[in-house]
């Protein structure tokens, strides 16, 4: 990890290092207009990168273990990860360095340690007595493959079975091999000529620790006497063995086999099993053997004091149950319950009241580890209900497609979301509390609310409470509820852009203050939601359909530093002819049978009941145009104060007024340039005869007939001194819009009438999927020539703000900044009606300002700073309940609109300048406004490209945080763009990371590390220092339960459990040393890490000891004061007694 710690050295070179930038600024600005210096508080010492926590279901699980005393659950994965779970909120993630699959886990029960066996034949001992567990020892087997391990309760000797059939014994304290070895050829019959196969089971007799039960894969089971070093009994069965389990009395054991049978054996009757059971086999007539079933992969045999034992197994279904879901079978007495699971069963464990194997087990629950879920079954209630899982393991319920992270949210947000989400909880869970409740919570120093929003492939959105490094689901929204669902594939309209997951979420735009939510889906649809605590029934879902298509012909090389792009026709990535429609043409098709004016999804036309929470405000869909499918949306922004939403794709940009349900702007990217286009692209539509779209303007489709001055510039009639060339260009553009508006007013009305029918006819046309994710399909060259490799310029960033739109502006005004994939930034002015009543009656006037800025690479993020360098968030409308009672009229709703403008601040004078911060794939610029001079510039990367850039608040200041495709995380000060942090963290290995990585305020960040897990990290030095205290503790001192009472007669006649002195048997004195070539001992870093991890714990203990000492001192002081008071009282009493004695000393008794 590398930080700019040499910044202090470089500070001495500030004069020399800044001279070049000063010269550059002097070239950009006249000496009299030099930018004022802003005192920046963030330094490199404020930054440090470290992982915090990992949430979600362990990806590709492979092993399971449970400590019945500490109540801690461990899960191992195929990638070498280790996840530990305690009480809700206590989780831990560890990773084996080798990355080999975990094949088995064994707790040292109530010792705060865990042994993991990996597929690379390595054993590791983990220390769990520290907040970040670490490996204490490792043992690498060199000549044999490890297949099974067993660690008896309260024993330090670990039995290790191998693929060759041998058993080695490891001392878990020193992690060294004992010289005692059980060879396979000594365990089986001497007359047997075949190898018994790998060891699949090892366990000691619950009543006699000197007897070891060894199960071989071939079907042979051996009861080995450890003292005499010979086999007492051998049990043979024709079918392969998968698992073995003891009855607690040690007189019987049960085996599961590959033919779906269970065999129960008496220890002293090795000839044949006492009972053979086929749980799912069909009993045939004439006493014939049942038909074979699928293998029973695992069986457990648990006893109770008050009833029949439990036999619990996985697998064993009959072969004719094709397509049946995986099952867990619970056999209790004469009843058999088959519990179906949603995914394949990896492993399961029965949770029992006692850790002693020689006592009645009293099982109360079963933990079932599935391929993609963790299920806990209550054995004590009828019907075996499941426990409600408190862990955040449902992140992957549907694949995550996008993420957003919000730190320091309004304090009332989480309770509001929780209250509406609580009504969505399922019923029928067990009434008992979650039994895995070990560990203790950390002392969370962070108190600000954090919310994570995840978008999913099925169109659902989940809100998560991420405060204090925990994660809890708050609320789930299903966006697909507003659309009609096809009953089968034949009924599905062939207008989908994608064949699967047509409702998948691509972009989320959320305003925490107003609670307005806007999403963009993969089918080129946008849905706006408003938060409400009241249930409503929407009779007609408001919707708009937008035509957005623009094609170009030729591109000529512009004069200047930027080479031209190579362009291809827009609208379809192939030039193949479009097949004619096979169904009769209707109003939704153009004259030659091509699909036209048809959205990809069909909105429901029936009343929609909307529960409290997020409720649909407006549905916007892009439609097919002339046989061309709409391009997926690449950028989205919403502003609750203005009541506007804007979105763009590779064809252009559209702005919608969601209050008036009207389209305000519908332009191609080329039209934003006007006559300033450096690429001289000539618009052309090959279907002009069918689509009278004008000489360069896309159809401006709006929800209502809008006056022709809708796009008039608010300054076009003013006499303010603008640049004459810019003013002429703007005026020419406005006249062009006005002319086209008049010419096509009838055509717009006709198109709207067509759209209102919302017809969607099937077609054989299949969309091209090569541009499935436009936001990541860009070329990564080192200059603006990256557009050479793409066919169109897409909208990549959108930002609403109140700032200066032109150089000569004297005051800020509402506007929209638009960034494109070729590094161009446009400014669009917004003229909003004054007053809430006028806002709903008069149109919003939208017009390009003529301001164009350029950077290298696609623009990713834009933000604005005031003259003091403070972040200026967009204006917003505070949340109010929108669904007022019916008796209140419309004026009451109008009064509730209280837009809040936070930019510019009230303390800031109108004349003070602002700064626009623009981050692209290659560089960042800080533009001074209104002069539009480049105040600061930083080339972020030359050889790679920025995947995510965010302007975030940290330590009462602001900075730019970037994540590059080469794995570097960087931060820069604002506005000077000084490098503060540059750490190599994670290279871009898949698009999942690029799609989900995001920064948040207060030094937080996250990304989807696997399809099922979210990794959180921090780049704040303060958070890194406090992390140790924030993490939970896995180990807590707990008294080990007392061993079961042997009873008088059992102790007298030897009927109780027999103990074994394993130290004497396996120690070096009696068994010698093992061969050095057999296994290699590797000391782990756990000792050093334990010291580091315990440092803060020691400090805490010292503080608590000091506090206890102070309390003790106070108590001693109080005691001393009380003692002194008692002594004083005693002296006083003594004096009074002496005086009485002197007074009555000479008197006779009768004189009293």
Curated annotation (Swiss-Prot):
> Does DNA-binding count among this protein's keywords?
no
Q: How does it sit in the membrane?
A: Peripheral membrane protein
Q: What is this protein called?
A: Syntaxin-binding protein 5
Note down the stretches annotated as region Disordered: 14-35, 557-596, 675-731, 879-907
Q: Quote the PTM field.
A: Phosphorylation by PKA reduces interaction with STX1A and enhances synaptic neurotransmitter release.
Q: Can you state the subunit structure given in the record?
A: Part of a complex that contains STXBP5, STX4A and SNAP23. Interacts with STX1A and STX4A via its v-SNARE homology domain. Part of a complex that contains STX1, STXBP5, SNAP25 and SYT1.
Tell me which residues make up the v-SNARE coiled-coil homology domain.
1087-1147
Tell me what happens on changing residue 724 to D.
Reduces interaction with STX1A
**What's the short name of a Pfam family annotated to this entry?**
LLGL
